[in-house]
Amino acid sequence: MYGGKSAEHNVSLQTALAVIKALNTEKFDIHPIYITEKGEWVRGARLTEPVSNVKMLQFEQGGSAFSPAALNQEMFPQEASQQNEAIDVVFPLLHGPNGEDGTIQGMLELLNIPYVGNGVLASSAGMDKVVMKHLFAQVGLAQAKYAAFLKKDWTRSPKESCEEVEQELGYPCFVKPANLGSSVGISKCRNREELQKAFELAFQYDRKVVVEEGINGREIEIGVLGNDDPKCSVVGEIAPKTDFYDYKAKYEDGDTDLMIPAIVTDEEYATISDMAIKAFKAIDGSGLVRADFFLTADGEVLINEVNTMPGFTPFSMFPLLWKEAGVEYADLIEQLVELAKERHAEKQLIKHTF
């Protein structure tokens, strides 16, 4: 399942292409579900031939629209009615709002269909950077100072919003839409003029914005895999050649060095992995999470955020971290499918009557 009504639509297509290429077609029957930028659901025929580009996944010809409310029946109209066949697992490869934020996960829960990755709570908390930061604070995770603003606050008094940032955080700072990933709508600000422009940009993508103090430190990331007993990968480091790791550097230029594994001490790795698992449990994670940190020159570790559906593009950090840890891409995907089935089976044991 990929695409979606989100600013990260194209990222999702790239992720879907990479995952589909890696799936073992002798082991899995692959049925693509494309959600257009307008939010329309289109299903394609079972994939029996290799997919070489994202255009093939957009079904400009040959796809058929369907209602997501009857997902099993739409995908297997005859078989499902006879209860001979149904969807085993949905793999949501959706990024951003209307996909990674708990909405799709809620629908799949109502339909009682197993799905890869985080549930409703973890997905929504992981999408909203403000809620996420509140949860991290509650479990005692060190993080950079931040402030949150609603669009109505900015509209009412841009001057007050800017003054609050300057007094509480100072420059440089980073302005981000609260509910977007892939560095969409993010700006680095060094003065009032840049801050005003950054607010205006971020509010184009969300009604809520978070502003974070700038941290002078290395950008370290780690992968978390599992359900109630999660494990961590090696750590990696992002060294962007640009001013910061924005959308263009991530997905277009490749103008970033990924150092895997990152050079850290045993003590620093222990701290990072422990904090990553605490963050995973704080949002009630399942399946996978990529946790992002800052590591300062004096060894202080600050959590930045978690991503509940990290990218699976060929140059994405999450699969590369696990590859370095000894888990190949195709095996990683199969583990995620098994974790989805495990979590779903556990939920089926829950009583709903008393």
From Swiss-Prot:
ATP binds at residues 166-221. It is found in: Cytoplasm. It catalyses: 2 D-alanine + ATP = D-alanyl-D-alanine + ADP + phosphate + H(+). Residues 133-338 form the ATP-grasp domain. One of its GO terms (cellular component) is cytosol. GO terms for biological process: cell wall organization; peptidoglycan biosynthetic process; regulation of cell shape. It is an enzyme of class 6 (ligase). It comes from the Bacteria. GO terms for molecular function: ATP binding; D-alanine-D-alanine ligase activity; metal ion binding. It holds the Pfam family Dala_Dala_lig_N. Its EC number is 6.3.2.4. Pathway: Cell wall biogenesis; peptidoglycan biosynthesis. Keywords: ATP-binding, Cell shape, Cell wall biogenesis/degradation, Cytoplasm, Ligase, Magnesium, Manganese, Metal-binding, Nucleotide-binding, Peptidoglycan synthesis. This is D-alanine--D-alanine ligase.
